[in-house]
Amino acid sequence: MAQIYVLHENNDWVIPLRKAFAERNLPYAEWYLDQWAVDLSGLPPHGVFYNRMSASSHTRDHRYSAELTATVLAWLERHGRVVVNDGRALDLEISKTRQYIRLAREGIPVPKTVAVVGQHALPDALSAFAQGPLIIKPNRSGKGLGVRLYETPEQIVGAAERGELPDTIDGTLLVQEYIRGETGHIFRAEFVGGRFLYLVKIDATGGFELCPSDVCELDTFCPATPRGKKFE
């Protein structure tokens, strides 16, 4: 059995993996990618490498974990190692703009979106929309953090003048058309290798922090603690 390596920066998220590996008696090791040295002239070990890096890593004081992981993945792939969630997956994980472009390339419609770098460019971005409602969101984030809803473009201008727009770790904010669902729910589908696994129905009436993870650090709700029917 090949050694399994889990690349991550959040111990809470790998607890289910540790349990599953132990139950199956699978050999594994963890690479905690917060601060690390990568010898690019050396050879990586043989095995299967599972990338568990998250776009929200910087919210846990791991500012450069995603960038470090990109280097590690490139090193692994250079030497032909088996990688689950390779550099292409990480590239999409940490950039909503690239997610939307890829979706559009595959013929999947996405809401109208304008990427903005710099507050002075905000009026040009807003001019692309005739009216609201609109969403402002960071290009890189996770768990719905930093997503704000505004009913009109003028509300966004006011928020910018007051310094109330969300922080963005890569300097890019997205202005996006907001599409209200008929029931107030959104749906999250999971696929692996092109195969459909499951669909999660999420009540979105209470806000945008909608992470259906096993363990979350949301102030308003944690799916690890059952509460109503927010997640089905």
Predicted regions and their residues:
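Extreme N-terminal starter segment of soluble prokaryotic enzymes
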Residues: M1-Y5
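Conserved N-proximal alpha/beta basic substrate-recognition cap immediately N-terminal to
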Residues: E9-K112
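Short amphipathic alpha-helix with an adjacent loop that forms part of the alpha/beta core around
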Residues: A37-G47, P123-F129, G163-E164
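Short, hinge-like loop/turn segments at secondary-structure boundaries
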Residues: H46-Y50, I101-A104, F129-Q131, T152-E154, ...
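Structural motif
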Residues: V48-R52, I135, L174
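Short acidic/polar capping segments at secondary-structure boundaries
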Residues: R88-L90, V117-A121, N139-K143, P153-Q155, ...
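Rossmann-like NAD(P)H-binding beta-loop-alpha module
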Residues: E106-P133
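Phosphate-binding site of ATP-dependent enzymes
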Residues: L145-E232
